[in-house]
């Protein structure tokens, strides 16, 4: 079931280690989406507004939307949509142009409560290594980001491609970095 299901048959099934662990990861992901500075600012606003109150997840998310101006409707699916998202990753290296195309597909298999699922926002920390284990500086095509050894990919659709330039040999991907 989801972290915050719409209904449940037994309250003891609601408070499981999975719910707590997934809930913690969702909050960590929110801090990455919002950015550390805005995250801490939003948490302070949250306590100013709701200290001592019984609140809902909707209250929590609304504070972040209000304080950052970001629409978090799709992010809210992490609280309400059940199931386990699966990812398929493929790469195409173009040695002529020293480019790597990384393709990621998201699958959200049907569950007993919903046959059709919406894509979830997913963050993937990526690095690329050569065959000696040396990290490539990552430079994304059409991006103003400075080159770094690790890149945070924000996926918000079912299928997304990322192109990295200045890659002179087929790399080994290092996905899901902490």
Q: What function would you assign to each model-found segment?
A:
Residues 3-6, 18, 23-26, 37-40, ...:
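Non-catalytic accessory/interaction domains
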Residues 31-36:
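Acidic, glycine-rich low-complexity/disordered segments
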Residues 8-13, 43-46:
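Glycine- and acidic
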